[in-house]
Amino acid sequence: MFDQLDIVEERYEQLNEMLSDPDVVNNPDNLRKYSKEQAELQKTVDVYRDYKQTKEDISEVEEMLRDTKDNDEIEMLKEEHQTLQNKVPKLEEELKFLLIPKDPNDDKDVIVEIRAAAGGDEAAIFAGDLFRMYSKYAETLNYKTDIVEVTESDHGGYKEISFSVSGNGAFSKLKYENGAHRVQRVPETESGGRIHTSTATVAVLPEVEDVEIEVRNEDLKIDTYRSSGAGGQHVNTTDSAVRITHIPTGVIATSSEKSQIQNREKALKVLKARLFDMKLQEEQQKYAAQRKSAVGTGDRSERIRTYNYPQSRVTDHRIGLTLQKLDQIMEGKLDEIIDALTLAEQTDKLKELNNGEL
C-alpha cells in the first residue's frame, strides 16, 4: 500500500511543477486536465502526509519518553503517545479506501430516465414523485436539471420522463438509483382504503464525450414531428420535436421542447448516452456473472428500494437499510442512503482487492 502512496505523492509533486510551467498554464486543455488530476490526488496526499507526520510524532514522543525522568512529563507524554497511536489505524483505513480505483464515469453528467411500470395511473404518479425527489436532491448539490423528453399521464405524473443532471460528480451520486423502485400506499381514488403496490424503473446513464463513442452521421435517421402532451393535446404548433434513430442498433432518442435545434442536440446527447450505456451494461453483466456486488447488479429490473407510505418507511433491499424518514427522503434528502450505498460499494471493492478480506 505504501509503495502505491509514494507513487501518488510523487505524481502530485510532478503535477505541482507542471502547473507552474507557463506552457501548461497557457494551454487551457492541459491546464484543465492536469488541474483535475491534481484535485483528484489532493485528498489522498493530504491523508498520507498526515499519516507520515503522525508516525514521526510517535517516534519523537517515544524518544522524549526515553530521555525524561520527570513523572508529570512522563504522564503527559504517555497520553499524547496513546492519542497518536489511536490515530494511526483510522488513517490507515482511510488510505485503503482512498486507493480504491475510481469509477471512470463518476465525474460525468447524467441522463436520468424514469418510466412508470406496474400499477397504471398510480405508477405514473409515483414516477412524478421520483422526478420531484431527484430534482430536489439535485438542488441540494447545486446541480442543474433539464428535462429532455416527457410523456405525461392523463391522471397526473408521467408515463416516462428523461432529464439531464449536470454537476461535479453527478454520476457518482445518482448511479445507485438504477433499478426498480416500488411504492406501497393508498391511492387518493381508493375509497376502501386498500394499499396498492406500484413500480417505476429508473435508468441513470453517464453522458459521454465524442471521443468515447463514435456515432456516424450515415448511421442516423432523423425525423421531426409535432409533439403532444397528456390526452393527445398538441404542445407545439410546429414540427419541432425530434426523433433520432441509430440504424445499426435500433436505439431511439427523442426530445420535444420548443426549439428544433435544441431538440436535435438533446436527442443526440441522449442517444450517445444510451449507446454508451449498452456497452456498460454488457461489461457489468460479464462482471456480475463472476461475482455479486453488495449494491446489486445494476440490472434495470432488479428491485432496489421500497417506499412504504403507511409506515413512513424506506427500505433499500441491496444493503438492508431501512429508514423511517419517508417524508424527508421524498423531499430530496437522499444523502444518508447514497452515503451508505457508496460505503457498501467501496467496502466490496476493498474486499476484492484484498482477496475477500478487509
Swiss-Prot record:
**Gene Ontology cellular component terms for the protein in this record:** cytoplasm
Q: Where in the cell is it found?
A: Cytoplasm
> One Pfam family from the UniProt entry?
PCRF
Q: Which residues are annotated with the PTM N5-methylglutamine?
A: 233
- Establish whether keyword Repeat is in the entry: no
According to the UniProt entry, its GO molecular function terms are:
translation release factor activity, codon specific
Keywords, ordered alphabetically = Cytoplasm, Methylation, Protein biosynthesis
Q: How is it modified after translation?
A: Methylated by PrmC. Methylation increases the termination efficiency of RF1.
Location (main, coarse): cytoplasm
* InterPro entries registered for this protein in UniProt: PCRF (IPR005139), Pep_chain_release_fac_I (IPR000352), Pep_chain_release_fac_I_sf (IPR045853), Prokaryotic/Mito_RF (IPR050057), RF-1 (IPR004373)
Q: Which PANTHER family match?
A: LD18447P
Q: Which family does it belong to?
A: Belongs to the prokaryotic/mitochondrial release factor family.
Function text: Peptide chain release factor 1 directs the termination of translation in response to the peptide chain termination codons UAG and UAA.
| HAMAP family for the chain | Rel_fac_1
Q: Write down what this protein is called.
A: Peptide chain release factor 1
